[in-house]
Amino acid sequence: MARKSLIQREKKRQQLEQKYHLIRRSSKKEISKIPSLSYKSEFYRKLQSPPRNSAPTRLHRRCFSTGRARAHYRDFGLSGYILREMFHACLLPGATRSSW
């Protein structure tokens, strides 16, 4: 189980990303429209002004039940270990059992 502080930090990052999403997107559009490099520098500074944690690359997908960030399967929203346990307990319909 992941520490609760890590899960809360991840939620805060998601909120920041949603808050600054439009600012980042508009800045990127403006940068692509302007051909000269000297004018682009203003928009690059504007793109760097939001907090670092608002960048979408800082987000991690986490396991729904444990909060684990590694070995996450998008289709199920679970980590590999929990997914394997649920397969063996027949809690996921239509999934075939395998061992690795």
Curated annotation (Swiss-Prot):
It holds the Pfam family Ribosomal_S14. GO terms for cellular component: chloroplast; small ribosomal subunit. Keywords: Chloroplast, Plastid, Ribonucleoprotein, Ribosomal protein, RNA-binding, rRNA-binding. Its main location: plastid. The keyword RNA-binding applies. The lineage of its organism: Eukaryota, Viridiplantae, Streptophyta, Embryophyta, Tracheophyta. Binds 16S rRNA, required for the assembly of 30S particles. It is found in: Plastid, Chloroplast. It comes from Jasminum nudiflorum. The gene is rps14. One of its GO terms (molecular function) is structural constituent of ribosome. Signal peptide: none annotated. GO terms for biological process: translation. This is Small ribosomal subunit protein uS14c. Part of the 30S ribosomal subunit.
